[in-house]
From Swiss-Prot:
The lineage of its organism: Bacteria, Bacillati, Cyanobacteriota, Cyanophyceae, Oscillatoriophycideae. It is an enzyme of class 7 (translocase). F-type ATPases have 2 components, CF(1) - the catalytic core - and CF(0) - the membrane proton channel. CF(1) has five subunits: alpha(3), beta(3), gamma(1), delta(1), epsilon(1). CF(0) has four main subunits: a, b, b' and c. NCBIfam families: atpA (TIGR00962), PRK13343.1 (NF009884). It is found in: Cellular thylakoid membrane. It comes from Rippkaea orientalis (strain PCC 8801 / RF-1) (Cyanothece sp. (strain PCC 8801)). The gene is atpA. ATP binds at G170, D171, R172, K173, T174, G175, K176, T177. Belongs to the ATPase alpha/beta chains family. This is ATP synthase subunit alpha. GO terms for cellular component: plasma membrane-derived thylakoid membrane; proton-transporting ATP synthase complex. One of its GO terms (molecular function) is ADP binding. Its EC number is 7.1.2.2.
Length: 503
């Protein structure tokens, strides 16, 4: 018969009690009530935060947007085809973050920072919240450095500075993206990190843009964030914030950055779609009441930081598409009121062969000459006025039969100035080239040249200066102003080239 030893039993029980490890995992779990059209209604997520990431049973991730009394309205970052009514949802306790860092440069990513260019994983350990606070007043400095676009009409009349928000607005097919891409190409020697955010565009259009950037060697300093037309509305809504986060990383490291949001009309439409599906009350043009805030909180993140924070900058060039030139619609007026000026592209000018089709009359930069080099300020100060007076005279001259000599000469000069501002796509100009051509046009050196030959003369003059008067380019490039010596060299170059041109 086996003898029972109580002391042995008690020691075993004691060991078991001591080695017992009670780990309790508390998770906030809910149940799907309804799912469809990229949204879901969930019951039971009492502790959910606004903007919190939610994980569905099939691995789909969503964001809690509507926190209601008895349910949570979430938007999905995937198709959600495998989510069923009654399936469980877990709150992650996290807010959306994206990878940031040097490893992203030259890559094409989606709205969550995942690579979509087939070049393998992105090796970076750093992440940043998609939504982050914009710099405050003390953290900022006034815009004082130029962000050269390489487009004479913009750099001379509507200058953009580092840290500015300048809206590019116009009808479809008026060259909005072309201006943005030219600006990226022009940063090649400027040490600026560029982020191009494509929102709701055709994949073929985005591929074309990437092809242009690669051809011009611009992908070496550019990140492309693409939320294509076939991507869920949630990703189209998030893409601009992702681009801003990636640029912010470099801005806080003291670097200059440029972000292009192409275009925010499609982001607003994606947000309207999500809001209506979540049963939020519609307002003007069926947009929700907070559509202004989605753009203001995005564009306020662009800044020129104070020297104490490293002096970095984020320049934002948002794009807005208008319908039949109507800038008084809801989204265009919202974004115009948030930005520091707008470049208005006119379909009439575009169709009449004036490209870039910038309407100088209603385009404005609220930063103004603070964002111009001294050389450009000296030369182009009266360019906008000359063109405005010319446009007025041109309209008047259509009704007048005989014009006096002064009016005729002003009309002739205006026509030549307009020709000078024409520029082919993907061929941005250096500052000295812009200064030389603007100087020649404004000071009457082109008055004897026939209007159809002005563009040819301007291109030839630039080449002549590059080869024969390279010192002019050096002076303007290094001193950033038009010195007496530079002006003399320029006058000589114009006179010599006019002779060679046969004028």
């Amino acid at each position: 018969m086996v003898s029972i030893r109580p002391d042995e039993i008690s020691s075993i029980i004691r060991q078991q009690i001591e080695s017992y490890d009670q780990t309790v995992t508390v998770s906030n779990v809910g149940t799907v009530l309804q799912v469809g059209d990229g949204t879901a209604r969930i019951y039971g997520l009492e502790q959910a935060m606004a903007g919190e990431l939610l994980e569905f049973e099939d691995g789909t991730v969503g964001i809690a947007l509507n926190l209601e009394e008895d349910n949570v309205g979430a938007v999905l970052m995937g198709t959600g085809l495998d989510i069923q009514e009654g399936s469980t949802v877990k709150a992650t306790g996290k807010i959306a973050q994206v990878p940031v860092g040097e490893a992203l440069i030259g890559r094409v990513v989606d709205a969550l920072g995942r690579p979509i260019d087939g070049k393998g994983d992105i090796n970076t350990t750093e992440t940043r919240l998609i939504e982050s606070m914009a710099p405050g007043i003390v953290a900022r400095k006034s815009v004082c450095e130029p962000m050269q676009t390489g487009i004479t009409a913009i750099d001379a009349m509507i200058p953009v500075g580092r840290g500015q928000r300048e809206l590019i607005i116009g009808d479809r097919k008026t060259g909005k993206t072309a201006i943005a891409i030219d600006t990226i190409i022009n940063q090649k020697s400027e040490d600026v990190i560029c982020v191009y955010v494509a929102i709701g565009q055709k994949a073929s259009t985005v591929a074309q843009v990437i092809g242009t950037l690669e051809e011009k060697g611009a992908m070496a300093y550019t990140i492309v964030v693409a939320a294509n037309a076939n991507d869920p509305a949630t990703l189209q809504y998030l893409a601009p914030y992702t681009g801003a986060s990636m640029a912010e990383y470099f801005m806080y490291k003291g670097k200059a950055t440029l972000v292009i949001y192409d275009d925010l009309s499609k982001q607003a439409q994606a947000y309207r779609q999500l809001s209506l599906l979540l049963k939020r009350p519609p307002g003007r043009e069926a947009y929700p009441g907070d559509v202004f805030y989605i753009h203001s909180r995005l564009l306020e993140r662009a800044a020129k930081l104070s020297d104490a924070l490293g002096g970095g900058s984020m320049t934002a060039l948002p794009v807005i598409e208008t319908q039949a030139g109507d800038v008084s619609a809801y989204i265009p007026t919202n974004v115009i009121s948030i930005t520091d000026g707008q470049i208005f592209l006119s379909s009439d000018l575009f169709n009449s062969g004036f490209r870039p089709a910038i309407n100088a009359g209603i385009s404005v930069s609220r930063v103004g000459s603070a964002a111009q080099t001294k050389a450009m300020k000296q030369v182009a100060g009266k360019l906008k006025l000359e063109l405005a007076q010319f446009a007025e005279l041109e309209a008047f001259s259509q009704f007048a039969s005989d014009l006096d000599a002064a009016t005729q000469s002003q009309l002739a000069r205006g026509q030549r100035l307009r020709e000078v501002l024409k520029q082919p796509e993907n061929s941005p100009l250096a500052v000295w080239e812009q200064v030389a051509i603007a100087y020649a046009g404004l000071n009457g050196y082109l008055d004897e040249i026939p209007v159809p030959k002005v563009s040819e003369f301007a291109a030839g003059l630039r080449d002549y200066i590059k080869t024969s008067k390279a010192k002019f380019a050096d002076i303007v490039g290094s001193e950033k102003k038009l010195t007496d010596e530079a002006e003399t060299l320029l006058k000589e170059a114009i006179a010599e080239y006019k002779q060679a041109f046969g004028v």
